[in-house]
Amino acid sequence: MLGLGTLAKKVFGTPNDRKIKATRPVVAQINALEEEFAKLTDEGLKQKTDELRKRALDGESLDALLPEAFANCREAGKRALGLRAFDTQLMGGIFLHQGNISEMKTGEGKTLVATFPAYLNALTGKGVHVVTVNEYLAKRDSEWMGKVFAALGMTTGVIWSGQPDAEKMAAYESDITYATNNELGFDYLRDNMKGELSEVYQKQHNFAIVDEVDSILIDEARTPLIISGPAQDRSDLYVAIDALLPALSDDHFELDEKTRNVTFTDEGNEFLEAQLVARGLLPEGQSLYDPESTTIVHHVNQGLRAHKLFQRDKDYIVRDGEVVLIDEFTGRMMPGRRLSDGLHQAIEAKENAQIQPENVTLASVTFQNYFRLYDKLSGMTGTALTEAEEFAEIYGLGVVEVPTNRPIARTDEDDQVYRTAAEKYGAMIDETKKAHEKGQPVLLGTTSIEKSEMLSQMLTKEGIEHNVLNARQHEREAQIVAEAGRYGAVTIATNMAGRGTDIQLGGNVEMKVLEALAENPEADPVELRAAEEARHAEEKQKVLDAGGLYVMASERHESRRIDNQLRGRSGRQGDPGRTVFYLSLEDDLMRIFGSERLDKVLTTLGMKEGEAIIHPWVNKSLERAQAKVEGRNFDMRKNVLKFDDVMNDQRKVIFNQRREIMATEDLSDVVADMREQVIDDLIDEYMPPKTYADQWDTQGLYAAVIEKLGIDVPVIEWAAEEGVDDDEIRERLIKASGDYMESKAADFGAENMRNIEKQVLLQTIDSKWREHLLKLEHLRSVVGFRGYAQRDPLNEYKTESFQLFEGLLDSLRETVTQQLSRVRMLSEEEQRQMMAQMMAQQNQAEQAAVQAEAVAEAKASGDARPGFVEDDPSTWGNPARNDLCPCGSGKKFKHCHGRLA
């Protein structure tokens, strides 16, 4: 019997069905224009772009221009790439233009889909950013789709780390710009450390199309982008604390695997206190609960987390004496990416690796808040429906499931649940042997390096040739993925999420052609391609006859979305395929979420060793467990966002203020207002309202005026005059300080003084903002404990961070006024010293930004510039004079190797 909800859907259709139905008339309009646009010459396509641009600038809506723009873009794609967009691809493009997430399955041509809304929205002249997860994809897509945009008379740019300034500026000024999420975020932070408006890369945030949107906006959401500088080295403390931790027993701490949290018990605190005192790390008589113990307690807690929550070869690997993190979602290494708050140092101490010093934050932003800067945001992915609530609540994005061009022919089987992990892996190997014997390609998905290598050993023992794709084999990634769909191929892979390369049945024909050309460079490329394509077609047919790609997963992930991504590797473009999850009661997800109950059921059923339970009910209960984990992770991300929103409001105020200062030629009025507010504060402090003259602290005011305003005026005598009140003294101070600053401007020249005011303002804002970020970090780390006193940590954080922000503004006014009052003409020697100091500071900031971005990009792709060797200047290309030197010194090229040029 049908439920009411199911019955209603049958009658009225789902919301998704209605959205699809609404686009069909628009798609019909585009198709009706196809013949007309096919008659246009190549120049005619570009002229059409000019016409559409003019109509957009004259006020015609983009929705009205959409059919013609999409028809023009489709024709350009046919001519430039030989690819004609399907109706489903046009639908995906329409949903992207409307500011939605288009869920399109693997192999449905998302890269081409992005060209349609990108072209339409670029007609306004405000630029479009197409965002990818790594540099390889950004460069590949910009080069590939750039041909379509060139045929339409539009410019395309690509952003990459270490790019020369002039090249990067030109890329941002292109109609369509391809970039990684990391590079965009770091450029935004860098822009807000610049001194001139002309140096700013990102002039506006108009429209962004985010590829693999779930990976960027959800998996990466809690990871802030940070530009940082070195702090004090405390490696001895980490080593000393690490030596204590192996002596802990199980009753000294409580481990909660569900929430990934570990805390000391009362017995643990007593044990620690005694040990810390005995080793001289805690003064005699001082308790761990005393405010003075905050730092030591923080380091001890991080040490405990390093030992109990972070596992080698699952969360990180140790390579060449360095701790390298592993991305839990993609299984990729993240060289240079470091955990914050001393946690990374605690892991380094645990592994006896070299302990790198902690860093101080110079600027930071989360992807959640960066991408919400855009006027319009959209995204593409193969798996978004399970996270639709989060996309709607945090980003205001709807999710639309776009139908596939051909029906999915893949078979998704029910999970097979075994009692033990050994039984599960044995069953996987047996099934792999059967598939391998008939030539069916097999992809074995695992959740950690350790498990992938264990499966590899089992396959080797059985004499089955195979490839392993995990963080250790990162360099061979593209080649391994390209071969995974070949006849008889067996591939073991840690999380396949976001790999960016399709597994094509019969292998990747383009890669085969390139390999054949490399082996036989004298051959005719056309003949060679034809021969390879014929061989590929034959091999593909053999794979299809064997049943297509067989995906076996060794564990359910915490997120259904990652499971769906793994399933989606099979059955692309209507190909046949098969997927099954092999599980055991010893798996993390099963163990944490109620495997005891299932174990009793299996015992009651009298299951024998090696037998599996296969039933849709098991799938349902597992999906409920996953939904619980997803819900908890969503709540955690929401909570992080609530706190980051507080800082984000302040960040926007400061960054907007910087932009205004850079854009304003004459800041003398701003500086004068600041000076007057400082004088108001001095009067209120030393001559409080509603007090008599004999209660005024005139000596204190006299000293403060000299210190803050740089003028020596007879304040004490003024105060002694008959009938003088605080307002009179305020006016006299405003006039005296104004006259003093005008005389300075006359000495320096008005233009020089205006430049000095701008530089002092910008430098002071930057230094005060850095101090403020540190205070907010400290506040954030302790405010959670207010919950024990029945006070809401978020409200406490809002209140105190606002007070800190008010303090920042007061301190900013005071410092700017004080510094400008002390400005004087420098001798030539002093000028030389100051220039050297400024150059060193600028180099340090640039080096910090470059290191941070290199770290992030290494995490995303590990791609290096082809042929680039750091020690070989002949491989550097043509660096601009103001770029950082490619040798890695951190100096500008003109001050390093460029001096020799």
From Swiss-Prot:
Annotated keywords: ATP-binding, Cell inner membrane, Cell membrane, Cytoplasm, Membrane, Metal-binding, Nucleotide-binding, Protein transport, Translocase, Translocation, Transport, Zinc
Signal peptide: none
PANTHER family: CHLOROPLAST PROTEIN-TRANSPORTING ATPASE, SECA INNER MEMBRANE COMPONENT OF SEC PROTEIN SECRETION SYSTEM
Residues given in the record as Zn(2+) binding sites: 885, 887, 896-897
Lineage top rank: taxon: Bacteria
Chief localization: membrane
The protein's role, per its UniProt record: Part of the Sec protein translocase complex. Interacts with the SecYEG preprotein conducting channel. Has a central role in coupling the hydrolysis of ATP to the transfer of proteins into and across the cell membrane, serving both as a receptor for the preprotein-SecB complex and as an ATP-driven molecular motor driving the stepwise translocation of polypeptide chains across the membrane.
Cofactor descriptive note: May bind 1 zinc ion per subunit.
Keyword Repressor annotated: no
Residue positions binding ATP: 89, 107-111, 502
A cellular component annotation (GO) from this entry: plasma membrane
CDD domains recorded: DEXDc_SecA, SF2_C_secA
Disulfide topology: none
Catalytic activity: ATP + H2O + cellular proteinSide 1 = ADP + phosphate + cellular proteinSide 2
Gene, per the UniProt record: secA1
Species, as recorded: Ruegeria pomeroyi (strain ATCC 700808 / DSM 15171 / DSS-3) (Silicibacter pomeroyi)
Gene Ontology molecular function terms on file: ATP binding; metal ion binding; protein-exporting ATPase activity
Enzyme class per UniProt: translocase
Family: Belongs to the SecA family.
Cofactor(s) the protein requires to work: Zn(2+)
Enzyme Commission numbers on file: 7.4.2.8
Protein name: Protein translocase subunit SecA 1
Keyword Membrane: yes
An example Gene Ontology biological process: protein targeting
